[in-house]
C-alpha cells in the first residue's frame, strides 16, 4: 500500500446540530453546514494527498439516504485520499451506492503503522475499548464516538488509571473536533506526539478527586464478588435500592458518595 495512513473520526457531515445553526453540541464554532464543510474540505486537503489512505473511525455522514446521495458523493469526492470507513453508530446507509464511495466499510480493523521508526499494531474502532487486542504488547488503539463530552473525560481518566494499575493501554480519541486534530486527518506519529498536549487534555485530565477511588472500589468489589453484576456491585457499595433507580439517579447517588468535587459535578 503506497501513501501514508491517516486517522480521523466523527466528521458528522450534513449534521446541522454540530453547528450554531442547530444545537452546537460539539461547540465546533461553525455558523452553519456550508461553513463547516468548507473548512473541513480545506483543512483535509491541506493535510492529505491522493496517495494517502484515510481511516475514518465512524460517523462520517448524517442521514445517508437516497435523497442525499449525490450531495454526499460530491462532498466525499472533494476530499483527497483513499477513504476507509470504520462503521459508527450513525453510519446507516440506506443504499449500497454509498459503499462505492469508500475503499472498504467494516466495523473494526487492525493495521500496522510506523511509530518512532518501529512497526506498531493499530486497533481501529469507533468505540473506546480499554482491553483491546495486544494492549499488553504495545498495540495502540484509536477511536471516536465520545466527541469532547463528559464521557470522553471519563475515558481519559480510566485509561490513565488502568496504566497506573498495571494494565498498559495506549488509547487516543481522534474525533475531528478535538483541538489537536482540528478537522484534518493525522498520522499516528502526530497523534501520539500531540495528544497529551492538546487543550482538551490539559483542561479535562486534572486529578480526578475521587474518581479513581470509586473505580478502584468497584474493581475490588468485583474481585471479591465475581458472581455479581454492576447493579449488584453498586448495591453492595452504596446501599440497597440502586437496582430500582434510573441510571441518572444511580449516578447521582454515586457522586454523592464520592464528594462535592468540581469534576464530579460535570457527570452529575
Regions found by a protein language model. Name each.
Residues 223-231, 242-245:
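Charged, low-complexity interaction regions
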Amino acid at each position: 500500500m503506497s501513501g501514508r495512513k491517516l486517522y480521523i473520526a466523527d466528521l458528522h457531515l450534513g449534521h446541522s446540530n454540530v453547528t450554531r445553526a442547530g444545537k452546537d453540541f460539539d461547540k465546533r464554532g461553525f455558523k452553519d453546514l456550508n461553513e463547516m464543510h468548507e473548512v473541513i474540505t480545506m483543512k483535509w486537503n491541506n493535510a492529505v494527498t491522493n496517495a494517502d489512505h484515510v481511516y475514518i473511525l465512524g460517523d462520517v455522514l448524517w442521514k445517508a439516504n437516497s435523497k442525499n446521495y449525490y450531495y454526499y458523493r460530491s462532498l466525499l469526492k472533494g476530499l483527497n485520499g483513499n477513504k476507509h470507513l470504520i462503521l459508527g453508530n450513525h453510519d446507516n446507509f440506506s443504499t449500497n451506492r454509498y459503499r462505492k464511495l469508500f475503499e472498504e466499510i467494516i466495523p473494526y480493523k487492525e493495521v500496522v503503522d510506523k511509530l518512532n521508526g518501529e512497526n506498531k499494531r493499530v486497533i481501529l474502532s469507533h468505540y473506546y475499548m480499554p482491553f483491546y487486542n495486544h494492549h499488553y504488547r504495545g498495540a495502540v488503539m484509536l477511536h471516536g464516538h465520545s466527541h469532547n463530552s463528559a464521557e470522553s473525560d471519563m475515558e481519559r481518566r480510566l485509561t490513565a488509571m488502568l496504566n497506573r494499575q498495571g494494565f498498559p493501554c495506549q488509547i487516543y480519541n481522534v474525533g475531528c473536533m478535538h483541538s489537536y486534530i482540528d478537522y484534518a486527518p493525522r498520522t499516528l506519529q502526530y497523534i501520539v506526539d500531540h495528544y497529551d498536549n492538546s487543550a482538551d487534555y490539559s483542561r479535562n485530565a486534572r486529578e480526578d478527586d475521587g474518581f479513581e477511588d470509586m473505580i478502584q472500589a468497584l474493581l475490588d468489589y468485583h474481585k471479591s464478588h465475581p458472581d455479581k453484576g454492576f447493579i449488584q456491585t453498586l448495591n453492595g457499595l452504596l446501599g440497597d435500592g440502586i437496582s430500582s433507580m434510573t441510571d441518572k439517579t444511580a449516578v447521582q447517588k454515586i457522586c454523592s458518595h464520592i464528594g462535592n468535587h468540581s469534576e464530579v459535578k460535570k457527570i452529575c
